């Protein structure tokens, strides 16, 4: 099983452009082409599109959601969900659901997780708004409750805008109930000893930014993608099951960097020894999604 190809993405975008046949969609798709299909819009581009089409940021985000959905990988559901995480910086980060055939359903990345992980890996400091084409499921509501902006986060749907996450997750259980002050998107203070070659060292450095306050099982994955190194990191959750594993994070980021057609030659995982491990799940996904053996280092 492989990740969706760039040609498949281009085909979906062409179909969407034909169906919509309106200036905003065409302009955004053209911009994506110019940036080699990296699924994000910088703050200056967001401002430019808002001015050009006389739209608010939220209206522009709603216009981007069907485009974000074109990045979905859905061999199981055949149902594409698109999301746009709006950073405090003003940048837009696209997300889409990522499913993996031939492996457990629990390996799935939800669209909101996809957009949030995309923003986190891109260096965004916080998320102010989440725009999505479908009502967030309970899994995603709980995942978003881990954010450092959970109390102010605004959720926007095509049929309903400007509702807080708290309106979707009443009497929520979250990190504060477990006395966690330094939450997702806050700076983490983890020190791990460096070792190994450049790919291993990149993985270790990424693991130092992982978020695992409940198990302490910080981990990261690095992919050798052509000449580039793409990393993903573990994002734990107070409810445990909505946690996002590092290989899913890395594969998702690869997709939104427009590199899904570039072969992965190595996959390395670094994990701190703790009460639990995600090695076996990650090993299975590496073999199924990439046809590669996971190189694993416990520190």
From Swiss-Prot:
Pfam families: dCMP_cyt_deam_1 (PF00383), dCMP_cyt_deam_2 (PF08211). It catalyses: cytidine + H2O + H(+) = uridine + NH4(+); 2'-deoxycytidine + H2O + H(+) = 2'-deoxyuridine + NH4(+). It comes from Haemophilus ducreyi (strain 35000HP / ATCC 700724). The active site is at residue 112. Substrate binds at residues 97-99. This is Cytidine deaminase. Keywords: Hydrolase, Metal-binding, Zinc. Binds 1 zinc ion. Its cofactor is Zn(2+). GO terms for biological process: cytidine deamination.
């Amino acid at each position: 099983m492989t990740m969706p190809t760039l040609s498949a993405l281009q085909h979906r975008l062409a179909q969407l452009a034909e169906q919509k046949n309106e200036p905003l969609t065409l302009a955004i798709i053209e911009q994506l082409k110019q940036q080699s299909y990296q699924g994000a819009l910088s703050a200056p581009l967001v401002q430019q599109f808002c001015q050009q089409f006389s739209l608010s940021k939220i209206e522009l985000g709603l216009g981007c959601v069907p485009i974000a959905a074109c990045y979905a990988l859905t061999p199981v559901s055949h149902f594409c969900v698109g999301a746009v995480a709006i950073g405090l910086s003003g940048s837009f980060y696209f997300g889409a659901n990522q499913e993996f055939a031939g492996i457990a359903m629990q390996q799935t990345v939800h669209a909101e997780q996809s957009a949030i992980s995309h923003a986190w890996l891109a260096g965004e400091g916080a998320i102010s708004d989440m725009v999505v084409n479908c009502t967030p499921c309970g899994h995603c509501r709980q995942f978003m409750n881990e954010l450092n902006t959970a109390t102010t986060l605004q959720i926007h749907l095509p049929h309903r805008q400007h509702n807080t996450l708290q309106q979707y997750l009443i009497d929520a259980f979250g990190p504060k109930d477990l006395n966690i002050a330094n939450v997702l998107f806050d700076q983490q203070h983890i020190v791990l000893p460096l070792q190994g070659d450049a790919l291993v060292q990149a993985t270790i450095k990424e693991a130092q930014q992982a978020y695992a306050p409940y198990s302490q099982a910080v981990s990261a994955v690095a992919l050798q993608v052509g000449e580039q190194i793409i990393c993903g990191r573990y994002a734990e959750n107070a409810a445990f099951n909505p946690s996002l594993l590092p290989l899913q994070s890395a594969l998702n980021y690869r997709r939104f960097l427009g590199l899904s057609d570039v072969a992965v030659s190595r996959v390395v995982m670094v994990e701190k020894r703790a009460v639990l491990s995600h090695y076996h799940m990650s090993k299975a996904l590496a073999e199924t999604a990439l046809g590669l053996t996971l190189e694993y280092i416990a520190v």
